[in-house]
Amino acid sequence: MQNYEYQVCSVQYGRVTFINGAWRGNVPVGGDTNASLESCPNVWEYLQEAGREGWELVSVITHPQERPDAALDMLYLKRPSW
């Protein structure tokens, strides 16, 4: 039987901010929020890299917010366990 690894990615303002609960930015969370957010990979770049590593996007869920541009997206990826 095939086993899988999974990633749950949080996306805010077009940036992948957390993967499985771990911060993805190069600038620590806190302080300058814009700098922290800008240090995270954008969705397109992240998905390109993840695809090269064997990850497949299997689902996206959008959690609407009061401001439409502030919606929180959750990306769900999987790949076979090696």
Residue ranges: model-predicted function:
Residues 1-82:
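Terminus-proximal functional modules
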